[in-house]
Every structure is written in C-alpha cells, then in structure tokens.
C-alpha cells in the first residue's frame, strides 16, 4: 500500500464527523481555508449534515452560537490554521457563559511546523483557555494511531460537553499533501478496525448519567414566594407562569423569557419605597434560568437573601450563576422536569403582593405619556409585542434591551439574546444562526454601535428568503453612558463616541431592502407589512436624539419613585 497522507487525513475527518453526528451535531459552520480541506470536504460529504459558510471567522463563530442557541444541539465549527482560530474567541467566550455547545474543529500545521517560522502557524493548543470545558489536541493522522483511540478520545470530550455544556476544542494538525483523488479503500483494513461501530450506528463509548430530580416542595405551599423568570425557552416560561399562578405568587419576567405579567416594569417600580417594601415581604425567591438584565432586580435579590430570604435557582447548567455569592439552592436539572414534578398535585394558593400591579399599571401609563406616540425607543419598546407578532425576537445588547426590561410587555414571544458576556459584537451573525435553526420570521433589534461592529455579517442575510426585519436604533453612539456616572468632560469623546453614520449604503452593499421611517405609524406599517407580504431581509433605521432615551427613563423613574 502506497502512503497517501491526504486520504488518511480524510479518513480521520470522516470518522470524526460521523461520531459528531451521533452525538447530535446537525449543522457545521465552515470558513474558507486550505489547511482545513479534509474537515471541509468530509463535512460536505456527510449527507445528514447541513453546512453554513461565512468568510469571516469571528462572524462564523457567532453564527454557530445562534444555531446552537436555537436548536439546543451542538454545532461544529471548521476553520483553517492561524489567526482564523483566534477569531473564534469572542463567540467561545459567550458560549462559555451561556452554555451553548460549540465543537471547534481547528485545522493546524503539524507539530514540526509550529514555532519555527512556518507560514500561518501559531500556537493553537490551549488558545481558548478556560473558555472551553474540554480540549483535545489530536496527533497528525497516521495508521500507527488506531481509529479506536480517535473515537474514545473524541467521545471523552463530547461526554464532558454533554454534562457541562459550553464549547469544546479539537485541534487537528494535518500534514501535507492535503489534496488527493485516491479512494479511501487503499486503507480498507485500517477503516475496518471500527467496522462494527460503523454498522451499529451508536456512540462508540457511551456513558449513562443519572437524572437529578428536585426535592419535594410540599412544605412551601404557605410561604410568600416570588418567581423570577430569566433566560429560558418560551415553553419553560409558560410552565413557570402556570406554576406561579397555581401557587398564587407574583412573577417577575426578564425580557429574555418572552413573557410578561401583572408585575411588569419592576426595574422602575422597585425604586418606589412602598412597592419595594411590599415585595420585600417575600421569604422565598425561585429563579428559573440565567442572566437577568435588570441590575436593580439583582440588587433587590441580594438584599432579600442577605436578610434571610431563601433563594432557589433552577437551571440545567452546572455552572454557578450567583454574582453576589449568596447562599443558594441550585437544582441542576431540566426546568421542565422540575416543574412537572412540582405541579403534579393540588395546592391551596396563598395570593399576596396584590398592591403591586397598581405600580406596574402606572409605569405603563406614564411611559405612554412620556413617549407621546412619537417615534422613540420608549414607544417602540411599549409596542414591541405587537410589532413582532408571531415572529421570533432577537434583542441586542444596547440601551434598547434595558428599555424593554423597564417598560416592554412581551406576550408569548420566543426571544433570544447574547447576555453572557453581553458584548456588542457578533449580533447580526448570532441572530442569523437563530433564524436558520428555527426557519421562522424574525425581528432583530440592535443598536447603531453594535451594528457597526458586525457589518460583515450582513452578508449572511443577502440570500435570505424568510422575512427578517433588522431594526437599527441609531442614537449616534453609546447613549447608554448617559445612565452611568462617567466623567462628563470625557463622556462624548471616550464613551459615547458619536460617529454620524447612517446605514442606507450598508444595506445596499449587501443587497438588503432599506427604509428610514419618520413616525411610529410608518414604522409599524413597514414591519407588519414586511412580515405579512415581504421576503428576505429589511433593514429599518430609526434615528433618535442621542440623549432622548436616557431622559425618558429618568422622567419615568422620577414619577414612579414619588408615588404613594
């Protein structure tokens, strides 16, 4: 048998992708490159894998993040060697905080070409540090290393991911040649060493893990509890609402839940002493899901627990979500499973906090008076649920997501965010991944600075068919800094950084439709009309004065704070 390194490279990659498929991978995101040839060709050859391509590795990582976020499956990412690998770090860091399962397949030079001046070769081992839950540095493909070893080694990494979530890194050093027309059958005896695995269709080395179940909560029926719903699926949010209604408890809904309640606007009314005092009568807080937007809710929660209130946290993610380091009972299990056990018997509800909905209603009433039906961020947040309709919603990390947290009321909207590191990068790409995984129409709300940061990824929408509306709220820079105690002399130059740009020609560059409405009525007509009759992507630019949103928020807070 003549040695053909290119064929051997592809045999290893074929084996790798088949095992990834058996672990649940269905989508593979691929960037161009020569060293990654065996990975790209074998991903393409696997008939049950769907490929997504992008020329920008940073955007590619976020595209994969969105796919994983929406599909709840691991997603593979293929890049070539060198700085292509380093560009994945922002998305990997986000996944490390929010739990999406990315499988990073990074092509590399063989070890003898690293650290010696060879082209496009950097130190890739350990490049993602503790942002990944496990790493595997493969040897260069060779017949002295068995395919059995390859499978058990890959399985160990993927089982670790199954338990803890987050990204894993498999570094793949491929010697040249990278191209060959020879058939794989020239190594048939080597391939046949795992023939039984190929025929049976299961994971090569399986692990069974017990499912943790929640403890009984019969003893808490008579307690005054508050239910907090964080970043969860819409179905989980609905189950949590049913549970709270059954128990007679108030519900505080983060916008990431896609739901609202009679206690909405809490980020504002928690500033009112009477409202805060009533909510503080609770003796148990049950939080479903991670990553709350409201800093004020975090502060109230911290004060309550420090005063002796019990704090339960339900999330399948083993990682802690406890930024104040409070005493906490963490139920590491499926939210749906926990709720199914808890709600399987009759209880006698003990309703309380009945005065708080009055404050919520006042927040909504006053917000509408302040906005005065004008085209502003507060008015858009108030009408967001009707704008999105039956489409999915992606909220960026600008001032607007906080506005939604303060005054928005989402009535059963599947909502997605990147609220791990809460970066302003990769939001176009992440939203594209979510939309591809779900195949639903989508409304994306993004700030102008975030949009500038990820302009490359508008290319992902160039051939969009399903209706997508991208709303860029353009307040000319970082208006959020109006809400922070930054030095006023340097606020504009060092924090807000006004740019003066508009996005019409960015839309044209990537073949997207574009409108810039001047009234709330026109905005509504454009968005609703595109979802009803349009196709592809529509970029809607909403220009607002730089300090308008922050002034509206301060007006609203001042009014509600003074209520008695």
From Swiss-Prot:
Protein name: 2-succinyl-5-enolpyruvyl-6-hydroxy-3-cyclohexene-1-carboxylate synthase
Free-text comment on the cofactor: Binds 1 thiamine pyrophosphate per subunit.
Keywords in alphabetical order: Magnesium, Manganese, Menaquinone biosynthesis, Metal-binding, Thiamine pyrophosphate, Transferase
Top-rank taxon, per record: Bacteria
Pfam families tied to this protein: TPP_enzyme_C, TPP_enzyme_M_2, TPP_enzyme_N
Subunit structure: Homodimer.
Broad EC category: transferase
């Amino acid at each position: 048998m003549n040695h053909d390194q290119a064929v051997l490279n592809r045999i290893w990659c074929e084996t790798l992708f088949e095992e990834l498929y058996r672990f649940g991978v269905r989508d593979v995101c691929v960037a161009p490159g020569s060293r990654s040839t065996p990975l790209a060709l074998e991903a393409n050859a696997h008939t049950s894998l769907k490929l997504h391509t992008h020329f920008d590795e940073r955007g590619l990582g976020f595209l994969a993040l969105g796919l994983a976020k929406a599909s709840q499956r691991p997603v593979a990412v293929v890049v070539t060697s060198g700085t292509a690998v380093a560009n994945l770090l922002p998305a990997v860091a986000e996944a490390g905080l929010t739990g999406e399962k990315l499988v990073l397949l990074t092509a590399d030079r063989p070890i003898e070409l690293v650290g010696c001046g060879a082209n496009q070769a950097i130190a890739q081992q350990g490049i993602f540090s503790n942002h990944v839950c496990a790493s595997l540095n493969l040897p260069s493909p060779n017949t002295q290393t068995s395919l059995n070893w390859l499978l058990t080694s890959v399985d160990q990494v993927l089982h670790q991911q199954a338990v803890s979530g987050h990204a894993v890194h498999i570094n793949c050093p491929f010697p040249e040649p990278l191209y060959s027309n020879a058939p794989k059958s020239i190594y048939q005896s080597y391939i046949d060493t795992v023939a039984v695995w190929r025929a049976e269709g299961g994971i090569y080395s399986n692990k069974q893990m017990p499912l943790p179940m929640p403890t009984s909560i019969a003893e808490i029926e008579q307690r005054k509890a508050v239910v907090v719903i964080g970043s969860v699926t819409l179905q989980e949010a609905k189950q949590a609402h049913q549970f709270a209604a059954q128990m007679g408890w108030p519900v505080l809904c983060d916008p990431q839940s896609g739901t609202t309640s009679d206690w909405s606007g809490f980020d504002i009314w928690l500033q009112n002493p009477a409202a805060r005092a009533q909510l503080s009568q609770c003796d148990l807080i049950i939080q479903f899901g991670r990553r709350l937007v409201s800093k004020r809710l975090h502060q109230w929660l911290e004060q309550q627990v420090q005063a002796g209130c019990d704090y339960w946290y339900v999330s399948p993610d083993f990682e802690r979500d406890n930024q104040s380091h409070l005493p906490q009972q963490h139920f590491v299990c499926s939210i749906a499973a926990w709720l199914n056990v808890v709600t399987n018997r009759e209880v006698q509800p003990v309703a309380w906090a009945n005065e708080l909905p009055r404050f919520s209603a006042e927040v909504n009433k006053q917000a509408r008076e302040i906005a005065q039906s004008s085209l502003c961020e507060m008015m858009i947040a108030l009408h967001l649920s009707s704008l999105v309709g039956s489409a999915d919603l992606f909220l960026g990390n600008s001032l607007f997501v906080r506005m939604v947290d303060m005054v928005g009321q989402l009535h059963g909207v599947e909502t997605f965010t990147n609220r791990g590191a809460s970066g302003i990068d990769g939001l176009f790409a992440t939203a594209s991944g979510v939309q591809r995984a779900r195949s639903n129409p989508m409304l994306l709300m993004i700030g102008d600075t975030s949009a500038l940061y990820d302009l490359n990824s508008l290319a992902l929408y160039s051939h969009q068919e399903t209706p997508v509306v991208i709303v860029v709220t353009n307040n000319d820079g970082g208006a959020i800094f109006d809400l922070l105690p930054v030095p006023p002399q340097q606020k504009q130059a060092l924090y807000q950084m006004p740019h003066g740009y508009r996005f019409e020609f960015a839309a044209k560059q990537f073949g997207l439709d574009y409108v810039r409405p001047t009234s709330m009525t026109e905005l509504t007509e454009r968005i609703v009309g595109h979802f009803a009759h349009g196709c592809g992507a529509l970029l809607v630019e909403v220009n607002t004065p730089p300090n308008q949103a922050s002034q509206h928020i301060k007006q609203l807070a001042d009014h509600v704070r003074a209520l008695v």
